[in-house]
């Protein structure tokens, strides 16, 4: 009833309820409605969303692309049960948001452009149009053939910061001011690099030490006052995405024989 608003950094937008459609049931959506479907839910809903989209494929246009805007890694797997590799893509978002009210999204931190690509080596050129549309809204967006590297870069960042920020009830920056929390974050970073090296994946840095230099000199200072999405979930008493963050590292550690205990 209050519409939708985007505030904070960049251009502000507001939309009244008569400027968009909300569907309460898939059956209410006309056939061939969507060129793109953005998956912006918490990752715990992916099994249900992927299944229901598959059951209602008639609402998707023939060349519809599903783009997953979520924390974590391998979030495309539930959708690949029902859709082909050239229909499912992932986004790397390293922009901070908060939701002061249910209808307001506030951009609190911006570090790098949104990146769109495929974890299955599909050509991302088909996403150029939607990347341009997102950029036109005020948040820069680009495509990449190396989305896996960038998603692992975000995993390094989120897995080191999010759980501790919740447990210690503090911002990202405060975590770097205590030697005990720094030691824990350093250990998490080491574990993730060990998993990456044993797996078929790669990231943007050659070693944990190389990443740590950037982490403490730029990445955390740039987001010093930010509270993680995991922290916000706990405050709202809703399920977190920890299973697709640190939980993914644990599962891959077990798969590749890396001690992440």
Language-model-detected regions and their locations in the chain:
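A general structural signal for well-ordered alpha-helical segments in protein cores
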Residues: 34, 46, 75-76, 127, ...
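NAD(P)-dependent Rossmann-like dehydrogenase/reductase catalytic/cofactor-binding core
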Residues: 135-136, 186-261
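Rossmann-fold dinucleotide-binding core
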Residues: 32, 69-150, 154
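Short, hinge-like loop/turn segments at secondary-structure boundaries
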Residues: 5-9, 84-85, 105-109, 159-161
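Helix-loop-beta segment of a Rossmann-like dinucleotide-binding subdomain
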Residues: 35, 57-60, 104-115, 166-177, ...
């Amino acid at each position: 009833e209050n519409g939708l608003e985007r505030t904070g950094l960049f251009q502000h937008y507001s939309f009244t309820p008569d400027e968009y459609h909300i569907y309460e049931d898939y059956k209410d959506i006309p056939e061939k409605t969507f060129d793109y479907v953005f998956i912006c839910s918490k990752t715990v809903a992916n099994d249900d969303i992927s299944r229901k989209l598959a059951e209602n494929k008639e609402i998707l246009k023939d060349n519809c692309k599903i783009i997953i805007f979520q924390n974590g890694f391998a979030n495309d797997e539930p959708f690949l049960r029902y859709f082909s590799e050239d229909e499912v893509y992932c986004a790397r978002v390293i922009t901070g948001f908060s939701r002061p009210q249910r209808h307001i999204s506030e951009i609190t931190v911006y570090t790098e452009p949104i990146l769109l690509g495929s974890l299955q080596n599909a050509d991302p050129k088909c996403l150029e149009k939607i990347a341009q549309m997102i950029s036109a809204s005020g948040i820069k967006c680009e495509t990449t053939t190396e989305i896996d590297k960038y998603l692992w870069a975000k995993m390094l960042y989120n897995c080191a910061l999010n759980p501790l920020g919740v447990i210690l009830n503090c911002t990202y920056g405060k975590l770097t001011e205590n030697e005990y929390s720094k030691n824990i974050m350093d250990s998490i970073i080491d574990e993730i690099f060990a998993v990456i090296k044993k797996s078929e994946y790669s990231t943007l840095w050659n070693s944990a030490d190389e990443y740590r230099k950037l982490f403490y000199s730029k990445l955390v200072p740039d987001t010093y006052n930010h509270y993680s999405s995991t922290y916000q979930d706990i405050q709202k008493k809703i399920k977190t995405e920890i299973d697709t963050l640190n939980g993914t590292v644990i599962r891959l550690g077990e798969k590749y024989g890396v001690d992440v205990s």
